[in-house]
Amino acid sequence: MAGGKGGKGMGKVGAKRHSKRSNKASIEGITKPAIRRLARRGGVKRISSFIYDDSRQVLKSFLENVVRDAVTYTEHARRKTVTAMDVVYALKRQGRTLYGFGG
């Protein structure tokens, strides 16, 4: 018999990864109240209704850059799991040092 749990497979099978959501659906997951809460935390009192789409695009590009750098650190270390330190180093590389997570 071949390897694997079922007995009829052809060798080892890697772990199933999450299916990728479409970009439009995932960016719309950042709701207006979530953007409003972020703005409140930053000290904003009133928010124009035109700001939400722009905020989503800016947040998307920022996170894409951070995640790309964090994954680069992870791949260089030959790991499959992105650690908090990978994210800290990615932010530091972009000039946004984050304290409180080691390193």
UniProtKB/Swiss-Prot annotation:
Function statement: Core component of nucleosome. Nucleosomes wrap and compact DNA into chromatin, limiting DNA accessibility to the cellular machineries which require DNA as a template. Histones thereby play a central role in transcription regulation, DNA repair, DNA replication and chromosomal stability. DNA accessibility is regulated via a complex set of post-translational modifications of histones, also called histone code, and nucleosome remodeling.
GO cellular component: nucleosome; nucleus
Annotated region described as Disordered, given as residue ranges: 1-29
Lineage summary: Eukaryota, Sar, Alveolata, Ciliophora, Intramacronucleata
SMART domains in alphabetical order: H4
Family: Belongs to the histone H4 family.
Self-association and partners: The nucleosome is a histone octamer containing two molecules each of H2A, H2B, H3 and H4 assembled in one H3-H4 heterotetramer and two H2A-H2B heterodimers. The octamer wraps approximately 147 bp of DNA.
The keyword DNA-binding belongs to this UniProt entry's keyword annotation: yes
Protein name: Histone H4, major
Methyltransferase recorded as keyword: no
Protein keywords: Acetylation, Chromosome, DNA-binding, Nucleosome core, Nucleus
